[in-house]
Protein backbone atom coordinates (compact mmCIF):
# COMPACT_ATOMS: atom_id res chain seq x y z
CA UNK A 1 0.00 0.00 0.00
CA UNK A 2 1.29 3.45 -0.90
CA UNK A 3 1.71 6.12 1.75
CA UNK A 4 -0.75 8.99 2.02
CA UNK A 5 1.60 11.38 0.24
CA UNK A 6 2.37 9.03 -2.65
CA UNK A 7 0.94 10.19 -5.96
CA UNK A 8 -0.90 7.56 -7.94
CA UNK A 9 -0.58 7.40 -11.76
CA UNK A 10 -2.56 10.08 -13.56
CA UNK A 11 -4.40 7.48 -15.64
CA UNK A 12 -5.63 5.86 -12.43
CA UNK A 13 -6.64 9.23 -10.96
CA UNK A 14 -8.75 9.98 -14.04
CA UNK A 15 -10.66 6.72 -13.62
CA UNK A 16 -11.55 7.24 -9.95
CA UNK A 17 -14.62 9.47 -10.61
CA UNK A 18 -15.86 6.83 -13.07
CA UNK A 19 -15.61 4.13 -10.43
CA UNK A 20 -17.23 6.38 -7.85
CA UNK A 21 -20.26 7.15 -10.01
CA UNK A 22 -20.94 3.46 -10.63
CA UNK A 23 -20.39 2.49 -6.98
CA UNK A 24 -22.79 5.24 -5.97
CA UNK A 25 -25.46 3.84 -8.30
CA UNK A 26 -24.92 0.35 -6.84
CA UNK A 27 -25.31 1.68 -3.31
CA UNK A 28 -28.48 3.55 -4.23
CA UNK A 29 -29.93 0.34 -5.69
CA UNK A 30 -29.23 -1.57 -2.47
CA UNK A 31 -26.45 -3.80 -3.78
CA UNK A 32 -24.09 -4.97 -1.03
CA UNK A 33 -21.07 -6.24 -2.94
CA UNK A 34 -19.59 -6.16 -6.41
CA UNK A 35 -16.87 -8.10 -8.22
CA UNK A 36 -14.12 -6.62 -10.38
CA UNK A 37 -15.75 -8.40 -13.34
CA UNK A 38 -19.03 -6.58 -12.70
CA UNK A 39 -17.19 -3.29 -12.34
CA UNK A 40 -15.34 -4.01 -15.57
CA UNK A 41 -18.53 -4.65 -17.50
CA UNK A 42 -20.19 -1.50 -16.18
CA UNK A 43 -17.38 1.02 -16.62
CA UNK A 44 -15.72 -0.65 -19.64
CA UNK A 45 -12.31 -0.94 -18.01
CA UNK A 46 -10.67 -4.37 -17.93
CA UNK A 47 -10.64 -6.22 -14.60
CA UNK A 48 -6.85 -6.31 -14.34
CA UNK A 49 -6.69 -2.52 -14.64
CA UNK A 50 -9.37 -2.10 -11.98
CA UNK A 51 -7.54 -4.39 -9.58
CA UNK A 52 -4.28 -2.55 -10.24
CA UNK A 53 -5.96 0.82 -9.71
CA UNK A 54 -7.46 -0.33 -6.43
CA UNK A 55 -4.16 -1.87 -5.29
CA UNK A 56 -2.65 1.61 -4.98
CA UNK A 57 -4.97 2.16 -2.02
CA UNK A 58 -4.41 -1.11 -0.18
CA UNK A 59 -6.86 -3.97 0.45
CA UNK A 60 -10.19 -2.61 -0.78
CA UNK A 61 -11.61 -6.08 -1.45
CA UNK A 62 -11.29 -9.75 -0.55
CA UNK A 63 -10.42 -12.61 -2.88
CA UNK A 64 -13.49 -14.71 -3.56
CA UNK A 65 -15.80 -12.06 -2.13
CA UNK A 66 -15.23 -8.99 -4.24
CA UNK A 67 -15.74 -5.49 -2.90
CA UNK A 68 -18.07 -4.23 -0.20
CA UNK A 69 -20.12 -1.51 -1.90
CA UNK A 70 -20.60 0.67 1.18
CA UNK A 71 -16.89 0.44 2.01
CA UNK A 72 -15.96 1.44 -1.54
CA UNK A 73 -18.43 4.31 -1.50
CA UNK A 74 -17.03 5.65 1.77
CA UNK A 75 -13.49 5.29 0.47
CA UNK A 76 -14.15 7.09 -2.81
CA UNK A 77 -16.13 9.87 -1.14
CA UNK A 78 -13.14 10.58 1.07
CA UNK A 79 -10.54 10.15 -1.67
CA UNK A 80 -12.40 12.42 -4.10
CA UNK A 81 -13.37 14.95 -1.41
CA UNK A 82 -17.06 14.46 -2.18
CA UNK A 83 -18.05 16.07 1.11
CA UNK A 84 -16.33 19.33 0.14
CA UNK A 85 -17.92 21.63 -2.43
CA UNK A 86 -15.64 23.15 -5.07
CA UNK A 87 -16.92 26.42 -6.51
CA UNK A 88 -16.51 26.76 -10.27
CA UNK A 89 -16.61 29.84 -12.50
CA UNK A 90 -17.77 29.67 -16.10
CA UNK A 91 -15.91 32.04 -18.42
CA UNK A 92 -17.83 32.54 -21.65
CA UNK A 93 -21.60 32.04 -21.86
CA UNK A 94 -21.97 31.13 -25.52
CA UNK A 95 -23.59 27.93 -26.74
CA UNK A 96 -21.09 25.63 -25.03
CA UNK A 97 -20.96 27.69 -21.86
CA UNK A 98 -24.74 27.78 -21.65
CA UNK A 99 -24.84 24.00 -21.99
CA UNK A 100 -22.50 23.71 -19.01
CA UNK A 101 -24.67 26.06 -16.98
CA UNK A 102 -27.77 24.04 -17.84
CA UNK A 103 -26.07 20.82 -16.76
CA UNK A 104 -24.20 22.28 -13.78
CA UNK A 105 -22.85 18.91 -12.67
CA UNK A 106 -26.24 17.53 -11.70
CA UNK A 107 -24.72 14.12 -10.88
CA UNK A 108 -21.93 15.57 -8.80
CA UNK A 109 -22.75 17.30 -5.54
CA UNK A 110 -19.13 18.26 -4.88
CA UNK A 111 -18.70 20.72 -7.76
CA UNK A 112 -21.01 23.52 -8.80
CA UNK A 113 -20.92 26.49 -11.13
CA UNK A 114 -21.62 29.45 -8.89
CA UNK A 115 -20.84 32.33 -11.22
CA UNK A 116 -20.41 33.09 -14.92
CA UNK A 117 -18.70 35.82 -16.94
CA UNK A 118 -19.16 37.17 -20.45
CA UNK A 119 -18.29 40.26 -22.47
CA UNK A 120 -21.75 40.51 -24.04
CA UNK A 121 -23.59 43.37 -22.34
CA UNK A 122 -26.94 41.77 -23.21
CA UNK A 123 -26.05 38.77 -21.04
CA UNK A 124 -24.49 40.69 -18.17
CA UNK A 125 -26.88 41.10 -15.27
CA UNK A 126 -28.98 38.10 -16.28
CA UNK A 127 -28.89 34.53 -15.00
CA UNK A 128 -28.71 31.13 -16.65
CA UNK A 129 -30.10 28.28 -14.56
CA UNK A 130 -29.83 30.54 -11.49
CA UNK A 131 -26.14 31.22 -12.19
CA UNK A 132 -25.54 35.00 -12.25
CA UNK A 133 -23.65 36.40 -15.24
CA UNK A 134 -21.17 39.22 -14.67
CA UNK A 135 -19.01 41.20 -17.05
CA UNK A 136 -15.49 39.84 -17.48
CA UNK A 137 -14.16 43.08 -16.00
CA UNK A 138 -15.68 41.97 -12.67
CA UNK A 139 -13.75 38.70 -12.49
CA UNK A 140 -11.25 39.76 -9.85
CA UNK A 141 -13.86 40.90 -7.35
CA UNK A 142 -16.39 38.13 -7.95
CA UNK A 143 -13.96 35.20 -8.13
CA UNK A 144 -12.52 36.15 -4.76
CA UNK A 145 -15.93 36.88 -3.25
CA UNK A 146 -17.26 33.49 -4.36
CA UNK A 147 -14.14 31.55 -3.32
CA UNK A 148 -13.69 30.07 -6.79
CA UNK A 149 -10.95 27.47 -7.21
CA UNK A 150 -11.72 26.16 -10.70
CA UNK A 151 -12.74 27.82 -13.97
CA UNK A 152 -14.26 26.43 -17.16
CA UNK A 153 -12.91 28.34 -20.15
CA UNK A 154 -15.15 28.56 -23.24
CA UNK A 155 -14.05 31.92 -24.66
CA UNK A 156 -12.81 32.54 -28.23
CA UNK A 157 -9.32 31.05 -28.53
CA UNK A 158 -7.62 34.41 -29.15
CA UNK A 159 -8.63 35.52 -25.66
CA UNK A 160 -7.89 32.27 -23.84
CA UNK A 161 -4.35 33.01 -22.67
CA UNK A 162 -5.08 36.52 -21.41
CA UNK A 163 -8.15 35.29 -19.54
CA UNK A 164 -6.15 32.40 -18.08
CA UNK A 165 -3.49 34.85 -16.90
CA UNK A 166 -6.16 36.83 -15.07
CA UNK A 167 -7.67 33.71 -13.52
CA UNK A 168 -4.30 32.64 -12.16
CA UNK A 169 -3.70 36.13 -10.79
CA UNK A 170 -7.04 35.99 -8.98
CA UNK A 171 -6.26 32.68 -7.28
CA UNK A 172 -7.78 30.04 -9.59
CA UNK A 173 -5.68 26.87 -9.48
CA UNK A 174 -7.59 24.64 -11.91
CA UNK A 175 -8.73 25.38 -15.47
CA UNK A 176 -10.85 23.18 -17.73
CA UNK A 177 -9.95 24.60 -21.13
CA UNK A 178 -12.39 24.02 -23.98
CA UNK A 179 -10.61 26.35 -26.39
CA UNK A 180 -8.11 25.19 -29.05
CA UNK A 181 -5.42 27.36 -27.41
CA UNK A 182 -2.67 25.66 -25.41
CA UNK A 183 -2.32 27.64 -22.20
CA UNK A 184 0.89 28.57 -20.41
CA UNK A 185 0.36 28.64 -16.65
CA UNK A 186 2.55 28.42 -13.52
CA UNK A 187 3.49 24.98 -12.22
CA UNK A 188 1.00 25.13 -9.34
CA UNK A 189 -1.95 25.54 -11.72
CA UNK A 190 -3.56 22.46 -13.26
CA UNK A 191 -5.00 22.72 -16.78
CA UNK A 192 -7.00 20.06 -18.59
CA UNK A 193 -7.31 20.75 -22.32
CA UNK A 194 -10.43 19.44 -24.05
CA UNK A 195 -10.49 20.28 -27.76
CA UNK A 196 -13.70 18.81 -29.17
CA UNK A 197 -12.51 18.97 -32.78
CA UNK A 198 -9.37 16.99 -31.91
CA UNK A 199 -11.42 14.46 -29.96
CA UNK A 200 -13.70 14.01 -32.96
CA UNK A 201 -10.77 13.60 -35.35
CA UNK A 202 -9.21 11.08 -32.98
CA UNK A 203 -12.47 9.12 -32.81
CA UNK A 204 -12.71 8.94 -36.61
CA UNK A 205 -9.07 7.83 -36.86
CA UNK A 206 -9.55 5.01 -34.35
CA UNK A 207 -12.75 3.92 -36.08
CA UNK A 208 -10.87 3.53 -39.35
CA UNK A 209 -7.57 2.08 -38.16
CA UNK A 210 -8.27 0.01 -35.05
CA UNK A 211 -10.37 -3.12 -34.78
CA UNK A 212 -13.56 -2.94 -32.74
CA UNK A 213 -14.01 -6.71 -32.76
CA UNK A 214 -12.76 -7.41 -29.23
CA UNK A 215 -13.96 -5.09 -26.49
CA UNK A 216 -13.80 -1.86 -28.41
CA UNK A 217 -11.44 1.06 -28.25
CA UNK A 218 -11.84 3.38 -25.30
CA UNK A 219 -9.95 6.47 -24.28
From Swiss-Prot:
GO molecular function, one term: DNA binding
Disulfide pattern: none
Record has Mitochondrion as a keyword: no
Residues holding NAD(+): 92-97
GO cellular component, one term: cytoplasm
Chief localization: cytoplasm
Assigned keywords, A-Z: Cytoplasm, DNA-binding, NAD, Repressor, Transcription, Transcription regulation
Family membership noted in the UniProt record: Belongs to the transcriptional regulatory Rex family.
Assembly description: Homodimer.
Protein known as: Redox-sensing transcriptional repressor Rex
Species this protein is from: Exiguobacterium sibiricum (strain DSM 17290 / CCUG 55495 / CIP 109462 / JCM 13490 / 255-15)
Amino acid sequence: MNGPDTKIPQATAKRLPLYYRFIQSLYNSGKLRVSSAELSEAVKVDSATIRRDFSYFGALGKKGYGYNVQHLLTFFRKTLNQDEVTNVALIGVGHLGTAFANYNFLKNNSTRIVIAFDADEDKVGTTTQDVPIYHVSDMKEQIKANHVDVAILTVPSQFAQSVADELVEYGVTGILNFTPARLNVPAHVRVHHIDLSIELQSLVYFMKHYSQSAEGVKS
